Amino acid sequence: LQIVNTSATSNVGDISFDGFYATRSKKDINAGFNIQFEDITAEKVIELMPAVDTLMPILKSFYGRLNCELAATTQLDTNMNLIIPSIKGIMRITGDDLYIKDNKMFKTLARKLLFKNKKEGYIEHMSVEGIISDSTVEIFPFIMKMDRYTMALSGIQNLDMSFRYHMSLIRSPFLFKLGVDVTGDDFENWKFKIGKPKYKNADIPVFSSVIDETKINL
């Protein structure tokens, strides 16, 4: 079964979808899809596709309108649920005029790094890309401006909810550049360490071509 060029428009955002479904037996079910959400809230993305919460758990702390793309192949169980460890694919998330709040990690880091607003962070623009494989999401480097800071971020989000992220403060009120490494078993149990920045300026590697090539090869 193959579905192509399917789209829908609603008051919660626009959705487009391409996909296929193939089965050799009840225990061997495969699917592939490219789903794109435009001008939609993070809450609705997770509601429509709960697997996104596993791929990028911090997304539920973002408020505002997002554009999201998830292209992947996966195995399905007999109830037609995604078998998370089998997912291989790419993800893209972009958005403007976003807020991150109701997030324990943000509040702790905002306090330690002397943010002006320690309750919520305003993000003028965000563009995140990553590759999903072997039960991990590799988040490629991206630039994000928040409060008085310009940050370069990258990391690994494991599908068991553990993670390892790095944040380089390439522009800040401090007289020297800092790096912050954040690791944890989940977003309730984590720790951070201040050290050297991995990225020195906003001229970070761009991996969009890798994302596009991976998407074509799915």
Regions found by a protein language model. Name each.
Residues 1-6, 10-125, 132, 154-218:
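Membrane-proximal interfacial segments on either side of biological membranes
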Residues 132-148, 152-154, 158-160:
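Extended serine/threonine-enriched, polar tracts that run as long, contiguous segments within proteins
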